[in-house]
Amino acid sequence: MLRLRPYKKCDAETIVSWFKDEETFYKWSAGRLGSYPLLADTLIRHYEEQEYTENFFPMTAFDEDGIAGHLLLRFPTEDKRILRFGFVVVDGTKRGRGYGREMLTLALTYAFTVMKAEKVTIGVFENNLPARHCYYSLGFKETSVTEDYAIAGRLWKCIELEITPEYSVSKTDGYALP
């Protein structure tokens, strides 16, 4: 069974160990944490810079064997009506077990019931098909917002997705990749 708890500094070493190659790292971070390889101290410092705000909530998923995933929840605007998910990752040795979907289902439940978000958004690179399939299966829908990132000498298109409580996975059978 997967559970969600607040991130702890001691999680950083495990989380950064999941990025075995540059492409995986950039699909996760969009370069916001510097270059590959990511060091645990870099992740810790980045999160420490935000820890005294009321809009930044890193979370860690765990199972009976330990840490299994990680994601970030943050309010991008002062009115705190929209919650943004980011830095979503599952331990590569645990992929294929439905942990990504389960972790995001827990996070969506938390977002809508505890944090009272009216909408949750997430960005995903067009070339990250497994993540896109996961998000669509939960009921996320594409918006018209896209952004291009220069990564490793190429342009990567980031697609903005959103979900509201009435379209969450608990109310649908999910959606297929468009």
Task: Place the predicted regions along the sequence by residue.
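Extreme N-terminal starter segment of soluble prokaryotic enzymes
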Residues: 1-3
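Acetyl-CoA-dependent GNAT
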Residues: 6-12, 17-95, 104, 110, ...
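Short beta-strand(s) of the beta-wing in winged-helix/HTH DNA-binding folds
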Residues: 26, 141-142
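C-terminal "cap" of GNAT-fold acetyltransferases
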Residues: 83, 118-121, 125-132, 137-138, ...
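Glycine-rich phosphate-binding loop
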Residues: 98
